[in-house]
Amino acid sequence: MLDFSLYVVTIAAIYAVFALSLNLQAGVTGLLNFGHVAFFGIGAYSSGIVALHGGNWLLGILVGVGVSALLGPAIGRLGRTLAADYWAIVTLAIAECLRLVVSNQTDWTGGPQGISGIVGPFATLTGNAQAIAWLVLCLVVAGVGYLVCETLTRMQFGRVLRLLREEPMLAASLGHNITGEKMRVLAVAGPIAAIGGSLYTLYISYIGPNQLLPIETFLVFTMLIIGGIGNNRGAMFGALVVQLLYAGSRFLKDWVDIPAQSASSIRILIVGLVLTAFLMTRPEGLFAEKLRRIDVRH
């Protein structure tokens, strides 16, 4: 039971990093990026490919961060000529193109079978020692990610992003480059998601095309809605809640006679019911976004 608990919390910490990066876009800036899993996949496959060719695990993370930092602004630049809803569809298409590329490219990405046997940073440890080391690392990375995102959102940069979300025309009239700001936030959020993807791959020692399905992005949106979209603390707690739901659903077979092939569908159903309940009763999530009030005196 201890092993399972350590696994659940570690995965939750990894997804918290993923959720924080999406919160910068969807929560703070109002950018609906339906293909955010692409950045997660870039980090994951970068670590996998580097490890496959005998490279250091840290180098794999750096490669993923670098590629995501370049891809993010390129995707953001597409918003210059596209409306927000069309841009969201384009991001989904880009993520699907990436998934199809890694599915059909066998030399580097392993094709449909993916890349297995990836060596992580704690390969010399065994048992609970390895699990605890991974937990500490992922919690530290999630904590640093939280501090970075919280600092950014409290700075003038964050205030500009919220202005873009609420009043884009006003932001433009004040001289802010809307496309430039979108490119900047994607240049920050993309690498954060890539770090989460790298940690995920190094932790489970495997990455395949199924980890890049669109449902992964929408699962993180669920985390944000449950935790509180626009709130970094909510993003982290939302990741924990969803992972606990995922983990707890595995024990349903001990109480209810559920066919093994239906287990994954039941898991999605439970998450969907919880999401619906939050949208109906507490749409602001567990931690509502707190906006600072500024008193204007004449």
PLM feature segments, named:
Residues 1-298:
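Transmembrane alpha-helices and adjacent helix-loop boundaries
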